[in-house]
Amino acid sequence: MSEHDGKVIAVVGATGLQGRAVTRRLLADGWAVRALTRDPAGKQARALAALGADVQRADAADEASLRLSFTGAHGVYSVQNHHISGYDGEIEQGRNVADAAAGASIRHLVYASAGPDVAGTGVGSWETKVAVTEHARNVEVPLTVLRPMAFMELMTDRKFYPAASVWHLMPKLMGPSRPVGWISVEDIAVIAAKAFTDPGAFTGRDLALVSDVRSIDECRAIWRDVTGRPPRRFAMPVWMFERFSGTDETTMWRWLRDNHVDLDTRPTQEIHPEALTVRQWLGAKKAPSRPGATGRGRGPLAV
C-alpha cells in the first residue's frame, strides 16, 4: 500500500512537457493523478490514461469548471503556456487555478513559474509568472513556487528548434560564454513530487531550480564529447525567428546578456541530490548529432 493511497493530485496542463513529466512521476510515486487537459482524446492524454491517470477535460479559463475538477483533490500542480493562451490568457488561467484551489480547499498548490522572479524585465513569459505568483500568494491556499531555469530539453527536442535557437540565436544575442542555469524536466518533476510528499518542508517557499551551470560554449563542448560531433547550428536571422516564434525568447536572451541571475545549484542539490548535470543528461539521452532546425511545436520555450 502506498502512503499516498486515496490522495489525488490534480495536474493542470497535464499534456504539456512539464505536466506529462509531473504526472508520470506522481503516478510512479503512488499518487492518484487527475490529469486535466483541454483535449482528453488527444495522443498525450491517452498515453497518460494508459499509465493510470484519470484524464478529465478542464478549461483553465473557467474558474468554476476548475473548482469542480479540483473537488476532492489533495493538491494541484499548475503550469500554463503562453504560446497557447497568450500573455493575458496565461495570467488569467494562473489566477483562476489559484482561486479555484482556494475555493476547493486544496491542501497544497505547486505553481510552475520560471525566470528570476523580478518585474520589469520586459520578458513577457516572465512578467506573466510574476503576476500569477503575486496573486497566488494572496489567496488562502498553501503555496510552493518552483522556478526552473532553462530546460535541458531545449538542446535536443525538435519542438524547441534547437539548431536555430539554443545553438545559434541564444549565444548570438546573450553571448556564448554567459553562464546558463539548466535543469531537466524530469528533475523538475521529481522535485514537484517531493513537494507534495513533504509539504511542511516546501510550503511557503519560492525555489529557483538549477542543477548545472554551463555556458553555450561549454554545452557545445560537452555535446561534442558525448556524440563525437558538434551540435547542428542553423544561422536563422533574428527577424525570421521572431516572425514564427515571437519576441519573447529574443528579449529574454538580450536581458540575460546584460543582467545577473543567481544560479546557485546548492538549493536544488539539497532537495534532489541526483539531479543531473548537462553532461550526465546528454549522456543518458544519447543526444542526437543532428537536432532538427525546424519542426512542429509552439516555440523554443513551450512548457
Language-model features, listed with the residues they occupy:
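Hydrophobic "lid"/C-terminal helical patch
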Residues: 192, 196, 223, 253, ...
